[in-house]
Design a protein with these regions (language model features):
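Alpha-helical transmembrane segments and their immediate juxtamembrane cytosolic regions
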Residues: 1-178
Length: 178
């Protein structure tokens, strides 16, 4: 949650979005880290072995829908939640993981192409570059524990630097559709 909060300000600064959520739009109001936080919660809700208390199926569905709604205003909307659950449910089957991810990403692309911008929508297929990384991943955590922290700081840091570059090149204008 803390890194989603920190990344919110870096993301909004990067793209010239108001720091106050929902001031201009409901779309792209915060970074993908918020949606990934919701995805982590969704894994907890969905995986009975991780909880010390039972949830009925209808309770899981309600909570998962709520997490998708909470993730909706972020970059990538609810799709990180859906893709994460799909990848987890198909653990060990890369073909099913990629097919499901492709279907979810295609829904996202279609919405963007029809409602906002075709080019930006099609660029989202770049996420498929993850396939080789998933293909060669052996399922074990690496030795360097600092990678997680490096990623969080790199993510917020690069957004902050891109925000400075945006201001230097274009002035204080919004550069994202929202």
């Amino acid at each position: 949650f803390l890194f989603a909060f920190i990344s919110h300000f870096a993301y909004n600064f990067c793209f010239g979005i108001s720091m106050i959520p929902f001031r201009d739009s409901i779309l792209n109001q915060t970074s993908v880290i918020w949606a990934l936080f919701c995805a982590a919660l969704a894994l907890y809700v969905d995986d009975d072995s991780r909880r010390s208390f039972p949830l009925k199926q209808w309770q899981k569905i309600v909570l998962l829908v709520l997490l998708c709604v909470l993730a909706f205003p972020s970059d990538w909307s609810c799709f990180p939640v859906l893709c994460t659950l799909h990848i987890h449910k198909n653990r060990g089957n890369l073909e099913k993981q990629m097919l499901g991810m492709m279907l979810y990403i295609s829904m996202y692309v279609i919405v963007w192409c029809l409602a906002i911008d075709v080019t930006y929508g099609l660029v989202q297929y770049g996420i498929l570059i993850v396939w080789p990384f998933m293909h060669f991943y052996n399922g074990t955590r690496g030795n360097w524990r600092g990678m997680k922290w490096f990623f969080y700081f790199f993510y917020a840091g690069h957004l902050f630097l891109m925000g400075i570059l945006r201001i230097l090149l274009y002035g204080n204008v919004s550069t994202i559709v929202g």
